[in-house]
Amino acid sequence: MKPENKLPVLDLISAEMKTVVNTLQPDLPSWPATGTIAEQRQYYTLERRFWNAGAPEMATRAYMVPTKYGQVETRLFCPQPDSPATLFYLHGGGFILGNLDTHDRIMRLLASYSQCTVIGINYTLSPEARFPQAIEEIVAACCYFHQQAEDYQINMSRIGFAGDSAGAMLALASALWLRDKQIDCGKIAGVLLWYGLYGLRDSVTRRLLGGAWDGLTQQDLQMYEEAYLSNDADRESPYYCLFNNDLTREVPPCFIAGAEFDPLLDDSRLLYQTLAAHQQPCEFKLYPGTLHAFLHYSRMMKTADEALRDGAQFFTAQL
């Protein structure tokens, strides 16, 4: 798509989304576009500090969890002693950026609104880790907490997965992995998916949308994919292109959230249409006027807070 043919996204987004886009952090250096991946990760962590401020206080615990790849950091957010379920959160960041600090406010709000224990899993980033390492680490963490639930005083009888962007793909891929390999980590009550990518190679929204404002041009998406996958054949894996998995049976209830001006929106629409066509429990909600990654901006955007509340409400309704 010739860039001039794309939609004028920054003219079309909502007033509160424009406020976010125009918010300057005076102490923040410029984005290191030509820097190393380590420098870009450091910048992302610094940039997100402002947006994570003011999150609800609650009991928080950190544990290192053993996997076949080594130790993986996890963080537990416990809003109440008697949680009705445990929700595993997988952060976004194109598989190459992000950590438990960059998504701290999202996890705290999700715990507060659901009153469930939320466990963030700091899966190993790409390109250091290649597909399917992140999924295997997530599954290993689930198994570990299921086996040690009494010691950690968490309720693993009912669990869920949640994630944004690349984390949404990991959330659903992990749920399908547990189903397909018949691994018991507790009943999967629901999966919460905010503006994920699920395997489309091309789409209308990928053509019309995406630019410097969201880091989701076709070239950007190709770069993330090349960093994450081990080889070309992985593109068709049912745990990367989730549309190649069996979505006609035993898919946990899915809350699918779409951002109106997100190039990945058609991934969410197709996922919803596929699940609905096969009578799998699912709900789709579009958030008007929003860009990809809007969930981070609940300090300033009522829509972001609403999207988190909607996901939490969907999950608790399944319990």
Swiss-Prot record:
Active-site residue numbers: S165, D262, H292
Q: Does the keyword Transit peptide apply?
A: no
Q: Which Gene Ontology cellular component terms are annotated? A: cytoplasm
Identify the residue span(s) of motif Involved in the stabilization of the negatively charged intermediate by the formation of the oxyanion hole. 91-93
Q: What class of enzyme is it?
A: hydrolase
Q: What is its EC number?
A: 3.1.1.-
Which is an annotated GO molecular function term of this record? carboxylic ester hydrolase activity
Task: State the compartments where it is located.
Answer: Cytoplasm
- Asked if the keyword Hydrolase belongs to this entry, the reply reads yes
Against InterPro entries, the record matches this protein to: AB_hydrolase_3, AB_hydrolase_fold, Acetyl_esterase, GDXG_lipolytic_enzyme, Lipase_GDXG_HIS_AS, Lipase_GDXG_put_SER_AS
Write the record's keywords in alphabetical order, separated by commas: Cytoplasm, Hydrolase, Serine esterase
Record's subunit section: Homodimer. Interacts with MalT and MelA.
Q: Which HAMAP family match?
A: Acetyl_esterase
Q: What does this protein do?
A: Displays esterase activity towards short chain fatty esters (acyl chain length of up to 8 carbons). Able to hydrolyze triacetylglycerol (triacetin) and tributyrylglycerol (tributyrin), but not trioleylglycerol (triolein) or cholesterol oleate. Negatively regulates MalT activity by antagonizing maltotriose binding. Inhibits MelA galactosidase activity.
**What is stated as this protein's family in its record?**
Belongs to the 'GDXG' lipolytic enzyme family.
Q: What is this protein called?
A: Acetyl esterase
The record's gene field reads aes
